[in-house]
Amino acid sequence: MNYTLTRAERKSQRHYPNETTQSTIDPIEGYLKKNILMGKVTKLLHKIVNWGRKNSLWPYNFGLSCCYVEMVTAFTSVHDVARFGSEVLRASPRQADVMVIAGTPFIKMAPVIQRLYDQMLEPKWVISMGACANSGGMYDIYSVVQGVDKFLPVDIYIPGCPPRPEAYIHALTLLQKTINEERRPLSWVVGEQGIYRKKMLSEKIQNRKKRISVVNLPTSEKI
């Protein structure tokens, strides 16, 4: 069960999220068992479509606080985010693929953020950038949402207060890896209309042994 299937619930009474998630296997394996030729063709189509999607991620020009300054710094010539096909900032959510929540999400701003997200066309992804967007950060008060995942489905979390532009670029590469393993509907008529996502281990778990093995910490001059 290395994949999760997310289906939209049209009759759900909840405002958001109107979806259910369950563990499953890669649907390509089922296609291969039924018909090897059609299974390989379907796998190739998903590979081509995912390649195009992951190399053409247009972010929505949207910022809430100081993390937005670090985000736009990644678009300068020093970092050159154009290498990843993500340099085209869009002023309209209808033309964007990725929404980066960069900053502090206030309670009054939450309905606006959610409405902008709903205006984005599928496929769409969300990156939570910074401690405030991840968990409220230092603002454990009534006016700040304690994490945007309370009302939005977050794909990638970026720790830091604020995170550096390199962290944003790293998040883009992780999102590209996630998109490369996705299985989305290729037609609104044929096949399952849910979204299959591969379960990816968090960077914290993957790098745990590496961090534990560090005994001699480098000095500030070597960093």
Curated annotation (Swiss-Prot):
Disulfide bonds: none annotated. Residues 1-21 are annotated as: Disordered. Its EC number is 7.1.1.-. It is an enzyme of class 7 (translocase). SUPFAM superfamilies: HydA/Nqo6-like (SSF56770). Pfam families: Oxidored_q6. Keywords: 4Fe-4S, Cell membrane, Iron, Iron-sulfur, Membrane, Metal-binding, NAD, Quinone, Translocase, Transport, Ubiquinone. Binds 1 [4Fe-4S] cluster. Its main location: membrane. Coiled coil: none annotated. It catalyses: a quinone + NADH + 5 H(+)(in) = a quinol + NAD(+) + 4 H(+)(out). The keyword Chloroplast does not apply. InterPro entries: NADH_UbQ_OxRdtase-like_20kDa, NADH_UQ_OxRdtase_20Kd_su. NDH-1 shuttles electrons from NADH, via FMN and iron-sulfur (Fe-S) centers, to quinones in the respiratory chain. Couples the redox reaction to proton translocation (for every two electrons transferred, four hydrogen ions are translocated across the cytoplasmic membrane), and thus conserves the redox energy in a proton gradient. Belongs to the complex I 20 kDa subunit family. This is NADH-quinone oxidoreductase subunit B.
